């Protein structure tokens, strides 16, 4: 069930679903696994907000366990394609593709709430079929793994060798550890939230 927000205006009351209301404030909320439908919705929202105002920042709030690599890369590429900066905020959990998208925010504008958790790892996949089919899938997952690791190395400032080691298995970080790692730029505390409001 999606919450509804009722607003008073000179012409009476208007009801919005919460996500539409947030979008008016240039806030996109990723609160589920990344799928094709989710990615298409987020890409459309990013493009819409760019068309509305190409100079004003967009805020992507993330509470996601990850999801489809290909769909996540579509969001990532769109974030880097559009003119407005995309500020990212981790609220709860940014794992796997969620962490990748968190790191994809504009430099200096990647943040997390204090008690959030961030997790990076290598892409997961499975293959079945004939030997040649399995070989094709294995080559693709190795390509994706290398691509994701190179992007994370660039976004964090960590050496590629460290990213490769750390993503070999689930690698969890606190918000402050993610700052030290270079995945985000700062931890937002209650005082900072009030100062920006």
Swiss-Prot record:
In the UniProt entry, which residues are flagged as the active site? 96, 121
Subunit structure as annotated in this protein's UniProt entry: Fourteen ClpP subunits assemble into 2 heptameric rings which stack back to back to give a disk-like structure with a central cavity, resembling the structure of eukaryotic proteasomes.
Sorted alphabetically, the keyword list is: Cytoplasm, Hydrolase, Protease, Serine protease
NCBIfam families, sorted: clpP (TIGR00493), PRK00277.1 (NF001368), PRK12551.1 (NF009203), PRK12553.1 (NF009205)
What is one GO cellular-component annotation here?
endopeptidase Clp complex
Q: What is this protein called?
A: ATP-dependent Clp protease proteolytic subunit 1
Q: Where in the cell is it found?
A: Cytoplasm
Instruction: Report the GO molecular function annotations.
Output: ATP-dependent peptidase activity; ATPase binding; serine-type endopeptidase activity
Mention one GO biological process in which this protein takes part, according to its record. protein quality control for misfolded or incompletely synthesized proteins
Query: Per UniProt, what is the name of the gene that codes for the protein in this document?
Result: clpP1
Summarizing the function annotation, the protein's role is:
Cleaves peptides in various proteins in a process that requires ATP hydrolysis. Has a chymotrypsin-like activity. Plays a major role in the degradation of misfolded proteins.
* Catalysed transformations (reactions): Hydrolysis of proteins to small peptides in the presence of ATP and magnesium. alpha-casein is the usual test substrate. In the absence of ATP, only oligopeptides shorter than five residues are hydrolyzed (such as succinyl-Leu-Tyr-|-NHMec, and Leu-Tyr-Leu-|-Tyr-Trp, in which cleavage of the -Tyr-|-Leu- and -Tyr-|-Trp bonds also occurs)
